Structure formats: structure tokens, C-alpha cells
Regions:
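A short, internal acetyl-CoA/4′-phosphopantetheine-binding micro-motif in the GNAT/acyltransferase core
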Residues: 68-76, 101-102
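C-terminal "cap" of GNAT-fold acetyltransferases
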Residues: 125-139
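Conserved GNAT acetyl-CoA-binding A-motif
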Residues: 91-103
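Solvent-exposed beta-strand sheet faces enriched in polar/charged residues
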Residues: 57, 100, 120-123
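Conserved active-site alpha-helix within GNAT-family acetyltransferase domains
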Residues: 103-121, 130
Length: 139
């Protein structure tokens, strides 16, 4: 049975392991821990297996921002990112939810579009040659 819940510190090691598997290093471990401590991290699990997580902030020009959605490579293309985003959007009190992805990440662009997010802008120069596309979902 799959479920989404707020992550606790007991999940930190598993979430960091998934993140490291995806990006190849542990550079975001402190960010993940802080998000867990501040209750800004949702996780998706299937039985006892954590398959993905989402980190959010509430300080994007006064609106909520989904800053990170990570799915374990072996669990991709199964709707986990969509489930995490939908769960977050359903619980937020914000009138607008923003997120972003690189122009090269067409899979995530399709996820946002399928969930009713629309393009809101572009930020150049974060990653050389790969602009960041900002998306918004208006409640």
C-alpha cells in the first residue's frame, strides 16, 4: 500500500540515500534535514520502501514553492512525483503554488502540465545553457 506523509528525522538517512543516488553526491543532506525539522518535507512510501520525497518553502514572494521533487530511480514513471505534488497542493493554504525545472528536464515539464501548472517565467544563468522554467498552479 502506498502512502504520503510528513517526513520525520527517522527518514533522513533513507531520503539522503535516494537524493545521493539521483544527483551523485550528498551536497543536499543539510537542506533535507532542515526541511524535515521544519516539517516541509513529504515522503512517498510503498510498504516499507521510501520511493520519493518533496521539499517546499513558503517564502517565494509570499507564496509556496516546491523546491525539490526526488523519486528513486527504480520507482520512476509510476506517478510518484505527481502524487507528491498533488498531496502538497491539496494541503497548502497558498492561493498560488510555484515550482521550477530545467528546460532540459522534459519529463518534469510534462508532469507540471498534466497537473495543471502553467509556465510563469524563465530564469537564465542558474545552470549554464539550461534555463530554469518557473511554473505556477493557481488555486
Amino acid at each position: 500500500m502506498s502512502d504520503i506523509k510528513v517526513a520525520g528525522l527517522e527518514h533522513l538517512q533513507a531520503l539522503c540515500a535516494i537524493d545521493q543516488k539521483v544527483i551523485g553526491n550528498s551536497s543536499r543532506s543539510d537542506e533535507i534535514q532542515q526541511a524535515i525539522e521544519e516539517k516541509r518535507c513529504l515522503l512517498h512510501h510503498f510498504a516499507d520502501d521510501i520511493t520519493g520525497f518533496l521539499i517546499s518553502t513558503e517564502d517565494f514572494f509570499g507564496y509556496d514553492f516546491i523546491s525539490l521533487v526526488i523519486v528513486k530511480p527504480s520507482a520512476r514513471r509510476k506517478g510518484i512525483a505527481s502524487a507528491l505534488i498533488n498531496a502538497y497542493v491539496k494541503t497548502t493554504k497558498s492561493l498560488k503554488v510555484f515550482s521550477s525545472t530545467n528546460q532540459s528536464n522534459t519529463n518534469m515539464q510534462h508532469v507540471f502540465q498534466a497537473l495543471g501548472f502553467v509556465k510563469s517565467g524563465i530564469i537564465d544563468n542558474l545552470d549554464d545553457g539550461d534555463p530554469e522554467i518557473i511554473y505556477v498552479k493557481i488555486a
